[in-house]
């Protein structure tokens, strides 16, 4: 029998009988740690799961960066993310291609923000501490802070140049200055930093960027330097032009200044179509008793001028057209079926009937109006109701007359129609038998008469 103690962890004793005979014992047992598999009153694991194992989330590291000569190598990934990426923007040809070559003298100090993708709860304090230590160690105290946090989201600093999804952008040719304080008048206008032509859709989101400056993380508020807005890369993979995402605000605390629906609105076209069901025409075929529903759909192109306001997320409205399936009730008379198309009712004919039973059908005036008009439908229904009422009255009077001619049911006013039909059939059969007997008796009497006439003739001749 294999031992219950795991080979990899000899100090742990198996308490679960289900895992007792397993050849490979797990490292964590359901009954060992109440943090994972606790009772119904236990709380689910939260952010302190990393404190329990003394681990930190390890995001994918950016490419290796070239650091200034006086600055030491980064000790961890958090410090490396905060350092400028100099090898990306070392080529002057690339700077001239993006129009950023003359932006180096606008502001004297670029400070790179943390990676907006990895600004979680557990890494935020480590990033703060790394920035403060970096600034105090090589670049001076961070106490003197600038007083322009509003343009920090949409503005860029002197070397503020970013490419693609890299959150660390910008560099300086010389060493960083020791004094980080800047007057509010030297804050850079976003229009000066980004001279690229932008469309109407993206320019609408630029004024909203300064108002969302408090949404940045604690790293920005502790250092208090102008933030850098990354320029969207041309080869982003979404198929949009390079200037479609130039003025998007950067939020490093996980709170996006633009909602998720903005990205969905960017993918929608300016010219959309609205489909409305205009006319519904219903026809009923009397031959096959099936409802035929015709939907007339008109398509109107809607050109919406997208100004400062956002487009609604569901402008493309498509009303679903569901065909109406109606089951014909064969027991009830259809109002669409005319009385001429209905099968003729069988009339009970009796030889003793005093008058012929007829169903008076007035000639139907044929109208040239369409079949779907309200006047035609109402007139047809009215004529059908009149004819149906007259037919029922004639049928009732026929049963009453037949009942009066049957001797057994003359005084029975509550006789059912089935009883009337049965008694009338028996009475007709009895009358036919009596008629046959009377015919035989008549033939005998005629033969007797012929014999008597012959005798009388013979007596005269003698």
Curated annotation (Swiss-Prot):
Ranges for domain bHLH come to 379-431
Positions of the UniProt region annotated as Leucine-zipper = 431-452
Family matches, as PROSITE patterns: BHLH (PS50888)
Q: Which residues carry this modification: Phosphoserine?
A: 259, 261
Which residue windows does the record flag with biased composition (Acidic residues)?
Answer: 257-276
The annotated subunit structure for this chain is: Efficient DNA binding requires dimerization with another bHLH protein. Binds DNA as a heterodimer with MAX. Interacts with KDM5A, KDM5B and HUWE1. Interacts with MYCNOS. Interacts with AURKA; interaction is phospho-independent and triggers AURKA activation; AURKA competes with FBXW7 for binding to unphosphorylated MYCN but not for binding to unphosphorylated MYCN. Interacts with FBXW7; FBXW7 competes with AURKA for binding to unphosphorylated MYCN but not for binding to phosphorylated MYCN.
In its UniProt entry, what is this protein called? Answer: N-myc proto-oncogene protein
Q: Which gene encodes it?
A: Mycn
């Amino acid at each position: 029998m294999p031992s219950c103690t795991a080979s990899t962890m000899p100090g742990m004793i198996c308490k679960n009988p289900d895992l007792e005979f397993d050849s490979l014992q797990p490292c964590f047992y359901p009954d060992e740690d109440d943090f994972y598999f606790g009772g119904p009153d236990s709380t689910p694991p939260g952010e302190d799961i990393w404190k329990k194992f003394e681990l930190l989330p390890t995001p994918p590291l950016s490419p290796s960066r070239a650091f200034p000569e006086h600055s030491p190598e980064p000790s961890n990934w958090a410090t490396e993310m905060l350092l400028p990426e100099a090898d990306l923007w070392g080529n002057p040809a690339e700077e001239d291609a993006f129009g950023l070559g003359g932006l180096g003298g606008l502001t004297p100090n670029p400070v790179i923000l943390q990676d907006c993708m990895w600004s979680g709860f557990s890494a935020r304090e480590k990033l703060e501490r790394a920035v403060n230590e970096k600034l105090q160690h090589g670049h001076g105290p961070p106490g003197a802070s600038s007083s322009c946090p509003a343009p920090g989201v949409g503005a860029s600093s002197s070397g503020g140049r970013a490419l693609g999804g890299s959150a660390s952008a910008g560099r300086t040719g010389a060493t960083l200055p020791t004094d980080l304080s800047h007057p509010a008048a030297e804050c850079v206008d976003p229009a000066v930093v980004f001279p690229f032509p932008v469309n109407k859709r993206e320019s609408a989101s630029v004024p909203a960027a300064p108002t969302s400056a408090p949404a940045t993380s604690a790293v920005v508020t502790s250092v208090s330097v102008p933030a850098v807005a990354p320029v969207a890369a041309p080869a982003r993979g979404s198929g949009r032009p390079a200037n479609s995402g130039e003025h998007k605000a950067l939020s490093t605390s996980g709170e996006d200044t633009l909602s998720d629906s903005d990205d969905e609105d960017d993918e929608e076209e300016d010219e959309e179509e609205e489909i409305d069901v205009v006319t519904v025409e219903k026809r009923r075929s009397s031959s096959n008793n099936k409802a035929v529903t015709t939907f007339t759909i008109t398509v109107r192109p809607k050109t919406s001028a997208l100004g400062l306001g956002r487009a609604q997320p569901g402008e493309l409205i498509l009303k679903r057209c569901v065909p109406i399936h109606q089951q014909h009730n064969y027991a009830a008379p259809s109002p669409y079926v005319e009385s001429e198309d209905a099968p003729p009712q069988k009339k009970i004919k009796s030889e003793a009937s005093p008058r012929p039973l007829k169903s008076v059908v007035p000639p139907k005036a044929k109208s040239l109006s369409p079949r779907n008009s309200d006047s035609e439908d109402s007139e047809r229904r009215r004529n059908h109701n009149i004819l149906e009422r007259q037919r029922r009255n004639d049928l009732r009077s026929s049963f009453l007359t037949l009942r009066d001619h049957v001797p057994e049911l003359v005084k029975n006013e509550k006789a059912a129609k089935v009883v009337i039909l049965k008694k009338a059939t028996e009475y007709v059969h009895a009358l036919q038998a009596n008629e046959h007997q009377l015919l035989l008796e008549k033939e005998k009497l005629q033969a007797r008469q012929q014999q008597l006439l012959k005798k009388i003739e013979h007596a005269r001749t003698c």
